[in-house]
């Protein structure tokens, strides 16, 4: 109580508080955290299950990450933890050996795990015994360090192939002071066997065995790290704070911030604190506004509005006069008939196609006789275009149509008999009139042959034409030209009429004055005889060929019969054989014996 009453004591305490506050900016923050440190000498043997029951997806998603976590949390070095790794499936494969590449380097182990992820796919069975024997051989060869702790960690998802041999090898390793731990992952793990294998009872805790699903694979590593590592508490310095920033406001309450460089993940890099610079001055209050009173202005009385006079009713409208009916329109005059179109000139008749030669018949069928060409129909004489067709008068609108008079000629009805062409008097025809079946000269020939443009025939002198001394092949109208080959129709194209059918089924010619009828020539008898000779020659050839083929068939049948008789006689001399009924097929047993050995008759050769 005396100290509390002494003023000097309070003064000293006040000075100490002020000094601490002023020097607080220089004090560094400290954070305490725990970390596992593995400083003991341990030879760790990792046995990795690579059987096909794991599957490629679990291998990539769970096994490789679990193995990577185990390597990253160990203090791997030459003097502390050394690693050996064995992959087992159907056979054991040593990936890392003690005192070799990857045994004391964490970076080398990461490279080996990456190669295992990219180049290996789980396959085969679970041969755990071969992997345990590999560890036993290393200890027997003294590849391990004598003062280091020997620990075997097995990563598996199933039951080993041979339970008895695996248990025997594990017991041998335990006698050599080797600790065995198992991590069982997946649904196919035999928990009872794994507990016995690591030396635990059926019930109770087992620190050297852990099992779970694939998602818990990485968390199950931590209990095994405690076997080789210990947790150490450490202190981390977070660094020096920077100066506080200015207050966010110029008056009243605000905030200030200071920052620093982060040296540890658990350290904060920014801090905020409240601040107050000064009180803000009060805002001046505006004086109240006094309203000015305005004198009231008297309101004038409003005069009442007089009612409006009622509007006079409108006069009724007069009814509209009915419209006068329109006069009937005069009937329109009938349209005048159009002038008839002039008839078009008749087209030239097309030349008839040449009759095709009969094709030679193919062997062996007999050639069919070619049909005789049909005679072309005689063309009807064209209508004289000089007589125009008269148009029919239009019907009168008032009266009905009058019946046609049968005695009056209708221009639209074509007569049955052709109309004779009209020849102007005194006109010379383009071609002379040729006599049909007489040798008499026509009466309309000119007196002198030189007055005509066409050459006329003259009587022959001893079979020679006296008018054709220069050119014996001169074209004379009445001269007969014999055909040069067997075709009787060659050269007759100009002599056969060429009809051309129009839309009204009548035939027209370019020359209206040519009334001569042309008839096609009939094939000569020589042509028919030559054709029959050719047919007889072809028929004789077929008969000869048929005879030869028939003879060859007869010779072949005789040879077959001879071979059959000779074979049957040889079989009879060879001894008793199986019954003929047993040799024959079931469908051939019903045939009569006489029909089986019947020789062809005389009529069969034909």
From Swiss-Prot:
The chain crosses the membrane at residues 544-564. Residues 235-281 form the TSP type-1 domain. Gene3D superfamilies: Thrombospondin type-1 (TSP1) repeat, von Willebrand factor, type A domain. It comes from the Eukaryota. Residues 43-228 form the VWFA domain. The keyword Membrane applies. Residues 409-425, 440-450, 459-479 have a biased composition (Low complexity). Changing residue 126 to A: Abolishes interaction with mosquito saglin/SG1f. Abolishes interaction with human AHSG. Decreases sporozoite capacity to invade mosquito salivary glands. Decreases sporozoite capacity to infect host liver. Interacts (via integrin-like A-domain) with Anopheles gambiae saglin/SG1F; the interaction probably promotes sporozoite invasion of salivary gland. Interacts (via integrin-like A-domain) with human AHSG; the interaction promotes sporozoite invasion of hepatocytes and formation of exoerythrocytic forms of parasites in human hepatoma HepG2 cells. This is Thrombospondin-related anonymous protein. It comes from Plasmodium berghei (strain Anka).
